Curated annotation (Swiss-Prot):
It comes from Homo sapiens (Human). GO terms for molecular function: calmodulin binding. Keywords: Calmodulin-binding, Disease variant, Host-virus interaction, Lipoprotein, Membrane, Mitochondrion, Myristate, Phosphoprotein, Primary mitochondrial disease. This is NADH dehydrogenase [ubiquinone] 1 alpha subcomplex assembly factor 4. GO terms for biological process: defense response to virus; mitochondrial respiratory chain complex I assembly. Involved in the assembly of mitochondrial NADH:ubiquinone oxidoreductase complex (complex I). May be involved in cell proliferation and survival of hormone-dependent tumor cells. May be a regulator of breast tumor cell invasion. The lineage of its organism: Eukaryota, Metazoa, Chordata, Craniata, Vertebrata.
Length: 175
């Protein structure tokens, strides 16, 4: 709604305003410095043909300019670019492992990626049984790349929750 009002105000009396601007006096050439005037007079007196050359129109150049044909095309709109981007190769997917965490929302996982639950599970398995859950086994089990698995095992760890008893009470030891 606001665009209609702005467009109406912008286009109001447009022709009269344009004609007024066109009919204004054109700006005159800036005055030359006095030292430049003397140099120009000296050069024109030495080379009088230059003054005629400046005022003369070059017919050959004008014919070249008339032969110039400019063919332009609008840039590709963003909608066409987005449409081209959406046409990608279909990715390979796999089903999530171990459905015991009630992962209702996750139907499939792209190959080379894992869910949060799977990441926590494999990190915990590797921490508890490092000789069984090696990087190679994790790579094969979850279809990941070797460098990703190595980085995951190197830089991520699961939390250990330890509850320390208050210092004034004795801890109950389990048998």
């Amino acid at each position: 709604m606001g665009a209609l009002v702005i467009r109406g105000i912008r286009n109001f009396n447009l022709e009269n305003r344009a004609e007024r601007e066109i009919s204004k006096m054109k700006p005159s050439v800036a005055p030359r410095h006095p030292s430049t005037n003397s140099l120009l007079r000296e050069q024109i007196s030495l080379y009088p043909e230059v003054k005629g050359e400046i005022a003369r129109k070059d017919e050959k150049l004008l014919s070249f300019l008339k032969d110039v044909y400019v063919d332009s095309k609008d840039p590709v709109s963003s909608l066409q670019v987005k449409a081209a981007e959406t046409c990608q190769e279909p990715k390979e997917f796999r089903l999530p492992k171990d459905h015991h965490f009630d992962m209702i929302n996750i139907k499939s996982i792209p190959k080379g990626k894992i869910s949060i639950v799977e990441a926590l599970t494999l990190l915990n398995n590797h921490k508890l049984f490092p000789e069984t859950w090696t990087a190679e086994k994790i790579m094969q089990e979850y279809q990941l790349e070797q460098k990703d698995v190595n980085s995951l095992l190197k830089y991520f760890v699961t939390f250990e929750v330890e509850i320390f008893p208050p210092e004034d009470k004795k801890a109950i030891r389990s048998k």
